[in-house]
């Protein structure tokens, strides 16, 4: 797990708005980026830093669930509350060993604490049935890998359109 911050001049407006409504103050936005491929994970982290103030990375869905407080049932409730309150967006690869991004999406949407957090699924494969399954299960968006800066802008515009 890795967290890093940076300065932002243009934040994802809708995520910032939702974050402000839920938390009542202007703290850094927090994106959880999940990908088993180190290069893809670093690329996503770099692109998100351009639009977001803070990015936490996880190398697989199980580590992401642990971070979110959904992994180990014995995890202390304070850690769960702390991390849930800070995550504004989850972006995850679809194909990962152990647990897929789709399974992570389902776990997040089943959680009463996390179901409102937007989840974006990424994949290098453009399979319409997979895309439709993810969107029908609550994914905010499905994006083709490798991500580019234009994709981050597309995500921003999509989230803004969903708000209105």
From Swiss-Prot:
PROSITE patterns xrefs: RESPONSE_REGULATORY (PS50110)
Post-translational modification: Two-component system major event consists of a His-to-Asp phosphorelay between a sensor histidine kinase (HK) and a response regulator (RR). In plants, the His-to-Asp phosphorelay involves an additional intermediate named Histidine-containing phosphotransfer protein (HPt). This multistep phosphorelay consists of a His-Asp-His-Asp sequential transfer of a phosphate group between first a His and an Asp of the HK protein, followed by the transfer to a conserved His of the HPt protein and finally the transfer to an Asp in the receiver domain of the RR protein.
SMART domains per record: REC
Listed Pfam families: Response_reg
Stored Gene3D superfamilies: 3.40.50.2300
Domain Response regulatory residue range list: 30-160
Subcellular location: Nucleus
GO cellular component: nucleus
BP terms from Gene Ontology: cytokinin-activated signaling pathway; phosphorelay signal transduction system
Residues that span the membrane, as ranges: none
Role: Functions as a response regulator involved in His-to-Asp phosphorelay signal transduction system. Phosphorylation of the Asp residue in the receiver domain activates the ability of the protein to promote the transcription of target genes. Type-A response regulators seem to act as negative regulators of the cytokinin signaling.
Protein's name according to its UniProt entry: Two-component response regulator ARR16
Organism: Arabidopsis thaliana (Mouse-ear cress)
Gene from which the chain derives: ARR16
